[in-house]
Structure formats: structure tokens, C-alpha cells
Regions:
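Short, basic, alpha-helical segments at the C-terminal edge of helix-turn-helix-like DNA-binding modules
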Residues: 71-77
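Amphipathic alpha-helical segments used for helix-helix packing
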Residues: 65, 70-71, 101-128
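Short hydrophobic/aromatic patch on the recognition helix
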Residues: 50-60
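Basic, helix-initiating cap at the start of DNA-binding domains
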Residues: 1-48, 65, 77
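Hydrophobic alpha-helical connector segments
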Residues: 78-110, 160-161
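Hydrophobic/aromatic-rich alpha-helical bundle segments in the mid-to-C-terminal region
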Residues: 124, 132, 146-195, 200-215
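Hydrophobic/aromatic residues within well-ordered alpha-helical segments
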Residues: 63, 70, 97, 101-105, ...
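Short, structured helix-loop boundary elements
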Residues: 21, 42, 64, 83, ...
Length: 215
């Protein structure tokens, strides 16, 4: 259902050692998860990974690049959805996005996005990245829907992505922990997608084929 997100670029150094890189990235996520950006140091990452600090700088130019790479490499991407119409596609996208936001990786990505607003070094690294994967994935869903005549071509794909993903993220983050397990998740997702589809003037393929539409 998901695949790994593309990692951010690293500087050219010694030949890569997959095991070493994995240890470093795991250590970076561990340190960030425990201490946040203010307590995130290359020294501590190197210590936990069991490598010299110099080895890290041969692969990443600074701690911001290391952290962004660590977070992105662990985050699943939401995509590869093509169920035949926009309604089904958006429902599946919403389910996958909900699962991601509720995961440890999703929480870490949200934390990284918040931290970049208060740190120029981190903001510079994040700012060089491509559009978030969920926007690229949703663009494909919307473009197919336009070709099928389900929505008008003037609808902005990014708007639909933000409406669905943004609402889900806010819903998850604002739901008290004690209520999360009893929240009517599927009902919420159904109502959300239905609301977005009505807002963009969605025309279901079966309705378009109905003889009554020609009158």
C-alpha cells in the first residue's frame, strides 16, 4: 500500500555502507523523537550509531540535512491508487493518510514541519525538497478524474489534497488520546470525502451514463 519516500540529497563522500547509513538514520530518529530539534546533536547521533562524527559529515553537510533524511526515509508515501473513479480513489487516499498521520512516522513528520518554522537551517533544507508526496499522488487522481469527465478541469489538484489531508491531520491531532480508539474513523472519512466531492462538483460515472442526464 505504501512505499518509501525519496530521501533528500546527500553530499558525495566515501562509498556508502548501507548498514552504517541505516544505523545512523535510526539513531537520528531516536534522538529527535526523544529530544526534539533543540536537543538533536550530531555528537549524540554518532554515539548511538557507534560511528565517528566525521563519518556523518562525510555523508550529510549538517545536522538539518541528516534529520530531514532520517525522517523522510522512514515515512511511507501515499499513492499508487487507481480504483476507477475519484470517489473510490479519494476514500482510499483518506484511509492511507489517516493511517500515516496516526503512525510514529507521521507524528515525526508533523513535528519536523513545525520545527522548521522556528529554525532557519532546518527551513532551508526542507525548502529545497520537492512537493510533498501526497500532493503529487493526489494530482494524479484528480487528472484522471478530469479526463473521465468527473470534475471540471479548473479544479486545482493541490486544493483537493489539502482539503482531505489537512482535515484529517487536524482531526487526528485535535482528538484527545483517550477518545482516539473510540472515534468513528470510517464515518468521519466518509463524511469528509463526500463533503469535498460535493464542493468540487463531482459527477459520478454512473450518473453521467444515466439516460436521464440527456434530457
Amino acid at each position: 500500500m505504501v512505499k518509501a519516500m525519496t530521501s533528500s540529497p546527500r553530499t558525495v563522500g566515501r562509498p556508502r555502507e548501507p548498514d552504517l547509513d541505516d544505523r545512523v538514520l535510526d539513531a537520528a530518529r531516536s534522538v529527535y523523537g526523544e529530544r526534539g530539534w533543540s536537543g538533536f546533536t550530531v555528537d549524540e547521533v554518532a554515539r548511538r550509531a557507534g560511528v565517528g562524527k566525521g563519518s556523518l559529515y562525510l555523508r550529510w553537510p549538517n545536522k538539518a540535512a541528516l534529520l530531514v533524511d532520517a525522517v523522510r526515509s522512514a515515512a511511507p508515501s501515499v499513492g499508487n491508487i487507481n480504483l476507477g473513479n475519484l470517489e473510490l480513489d479519494l476514500r482510499e487516499f483518506a484511509r492511507q493518510w489517516m493511517a500515516f498521520v496516526q503512525s510514529i512516522e507521521g507524528t515525526m513528520v508533523s513535528r519536523l514541519i513545525m520545527d522548521r518554522h522556528s529554525n532557519e537551517e532546518l527551513a532551508a533544507v526542507v525548502g529545497e525538497l520537492d512537493y510533498p508526496d501526497y500532493i503529487r499522488s493526489t494530482r494524479a487522481l484528480v487528472r484522471r478524474a478530469v479526463r473521465r469527465g468527473e470534475i471540471d478541469p479548473g479544479i486545482t489538484p493541490t486544493l483537493i489534497a489539502d482539503l482531505v489531508a489537512g482535515a484529517i491531520t487536524t482531526h487526528v491531532r485535535s482528538t484527545p488520546p483517550g477518545l482516539a480508539e473510540v472515534a468513528h474513523t470510517e464515518t468521519y472519512l466518509t463524511q469528509l470525502v463526500d463533503t469535498v466531492l460535493r464542493g468540487v462538483g463531482y459527477r459520478h460515472p454512473s450518473a453521467q451514463d444515466s439516460p436521464g442526464d440527456d434530457t
